[in-house]
């Protein structure tokens, strides 16, 4: 399976911060925002990842993450000249996807919770169909909303409905089989002129091929698209790291624990940083601090 991070958009909700840098390069406590969705794909066992962003921002992502080899992964990059909808990612990434299945994650979404890696790897291992994730919210009219029957089977999905049929939002993380490329090519732009991811999910639902996994109590899904939610996410990450004495979205740690890099490689990455807490954390990880 391959992965795509959609890190485009104009960032108008975070203006004027986004005059200085892409939204997905903003700090969320102690790491760039892009680290969080990248860590999610790595935890799913995905090592071949395409980052899609605007022509003006893409060089900054390349400078930050380069080819991904220091984390034992392969990173590629592609331009999205204009924000024409989330489903456009599969058209832009068609050649990258090839004959593989693909996961898409939005560049401003953060996930954290017990058993997250197992849940992600289960979704990534499915042979066919699509898997998305439902999360209970107080303001479902802001999201794509999924309706369930009494057996927790998805029966409808609506994009930002005026009268939501449930409080379960579809989060910004999606796993698809290879037919997603053809589906994306054949959906029509919505009234706002975008290729909606909800229409992709509806296509899978109509053919009986959509699985919705509910993120239960204990999971956190953070959408960092506003000033308030960006601050809340930073405070959440700080609290988790301080209370649990661990790092969230530490790419070197995840790469090591997933077997993508060795202890020697971690040591090499940590040495230039050994005078700060980040480097000390990496050295403790391999038992050398």
UniProtKB/Swiss-Prot annotation:
Pfam families: NTP_transferase
SUPFAM superfamilies on file: Nucleotide-diphospho-sugar transferases (SSF53448)
Needed co-factor(s): Mg(2+)
Taxonomy of the source species: Bacteria, Bacillati, Bacillota, Bacilli, Lactobacillales
Pathway: Carbohydrate biosynthesis; dTDP-L-rhamnose biosynthesis; Capsule biogenesis; capsule polysaccharide biosynthesis
Protein name per Swiss-Prot or TrEMBL: Glucose-1-phosphate thymidylyltransferase
Similarity annotation: Belongs to the glucose-1-phosphate thymidylyltransferase family.
GO molecular function: glucose-1-phosphate thymidylyltransferase activity; metal ion binding
Gene that produces this protein: rmlA
